[in-house]
């Protein structure tokens, strides 16, 4: 597939997602990095988003709860170029009923080449990167060219 460039803005749109056994870990991480995160637009699946809002007072665009379709809503936003970074603390030791949605979310983040953290260490690296508060170009699939080729 041909690639094109997308510019992630200086003010990022960040999705925050956590499985039940990882919510407290994500909450602690968000509270530690609140001064950095406040400068960006936050999105989250339902329960996680409401917990973050309650604990920090930060505005969070909350989707549905993950098992109720929230993971798919975040994935759709990624596909539309509306999410720039995914912080997803998932539980590798416990299966969840919506595992296919989880796999789809991670697949879309990979397809659209956005930064993804699945644990606190990687999330720390992302927010401490010199690029975190700057506009940065990434390569993404050239969907218009892909569509034109498919419709020949």
From Swiss-Prot:
| GO molecular-function terms, A-Z | methylglyoxal synthase activity
Q: Per the UniProt entry, what is one GO biological process?
A: methylglyoxal biosynthetic process
- List the keywords (alphabetical): Lyase
| Catalysed reactions, as listed in the record | dihydroxyacetone phosphate = methylglyoxal + phosphate
Residues that coordinate or bind substrate:
19, 23, 45-48, 65-66, 98
InterPro entries tied to this protein: Methylgl_synth, Methylglyoxal_synth_AS, MGS-like_dom, MGS-like_dom_sf
Enzyme Commission number, as recorded = 4.2.3.3
In Pfam terms, one family for this protein is: MGS
Domain MGS-like, chain residue ranges per copy: 6-152
Q: Which residues participate directly in catalysis?
A: 71
- Gene Ontology, cellular component aspect: cytosol
Q: What top-level class of enzyme does the UniProt entry assign?
A: lyase
**Top-level division of the source organism's lineage:** Bacteria
What's the family? Answer: Belongs to the methylglyoxal synthase family.
Function description: Catalyzes the formation of methylglyoxal from dihydroxyacetone phosphate.
Q: What is this protein called?
A: Methylglyoxal synthase
- The species is Citrobacter koseri (strain ATCC BAA-895 / CDC 4225-83 / SGSC4696)
